[in-house]
């Protein structure tokens, strides 16, 4: 076990150009931290404080940089993976809370899932940030994956308890294919392109009612109920 932070570790992503793992700690405070973990040394080798309240999982671009959704700030930023210098910042109309990212490298498209009163998926040029398409999606999306083999997007919703499949007709045109039922609270997802399997973790929970002091209390998860549901092609 390697100590990283006190709490609220959000995700860990391997960055191939540096050979390091970037670990996200989004604390919902005024600042969040990106940690650099060196697998060869098996230790944390760097920590970078950002003036961001909540950082969702980053997306490695593949050119030595990575995209970072900033949900509370309403932005998508791109950083250098070696220096952590800010390279780009994009804001999209009708996207108040960007929460999940995926990409189509072949057709140079960035997919941005946006939370809000009218949730949407933004399809943007991966180099310029220009919006190419937009379509409505389910609520509170926390993960998106692009299946290059079938040219399909996979979009889970833990609130609506489903997995939406969206077909890519061409780089800028998309259509919903189907909605597959999942478990409540199955927000997060891992997609294995080799086996074409989708993995959705979830737990049983109790949702406390809102109070005068807390409009949206955190759910209370039940012990020994963690599961991973697997979907095949």
Stretches found by the model and what they are:
Residues 1-233:
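Predominantly soluble domains enriched in secretory-pathway, periplasmic, or organellar proteins
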């Amino acid at each position: 076990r390697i100590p990283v932070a006190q709490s609220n570790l959000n995700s860990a992503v391997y960055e191939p150009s540096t050979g390091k793992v970037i670990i996200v700690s989004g604390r919902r405070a005024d600042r969040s931290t990106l940690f650099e973990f060196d697998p060869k040394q098996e230790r944390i080798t760097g920590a970078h404080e950002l003036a961001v309240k909540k950082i969702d999982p980053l997306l490695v671009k593949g050119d030595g940089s990575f995209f970072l959704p900033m949900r509370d700030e309403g932005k998508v930023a791109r950083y250098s993976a070696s220096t952590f210098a800010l390279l780009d910042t994009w804001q999209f109309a009708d996207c108040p809370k960007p929460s999940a990212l995926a990409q189509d490298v072949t057709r140079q498209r960035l997919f941005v899932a946006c939370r809000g009163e009218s949730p949407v998926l933004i399809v943007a040029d991966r180099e310029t940030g220009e919006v190419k398409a937009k379509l409505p999606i389910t609520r509170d999306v926390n993960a998106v994956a692009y299946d290059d083999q079938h040219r399909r997007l996979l979009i889970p919703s833990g609130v609506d308890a489903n997995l939406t499949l969206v077909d890519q007709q061409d780089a800028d045109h998309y259509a919903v294919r189907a909605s597959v039922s999942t478990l409540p609270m199955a927000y997060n997802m891992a997609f294995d392109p080799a086996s074409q399997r989708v993995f959705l973790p979830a737990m049983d929970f109790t949702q406390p009612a809102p109070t005068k002091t807390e409009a949206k209390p955190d759910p209370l998860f039940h012990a020994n109920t963690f599961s991973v549901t697997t979907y095949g092609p």
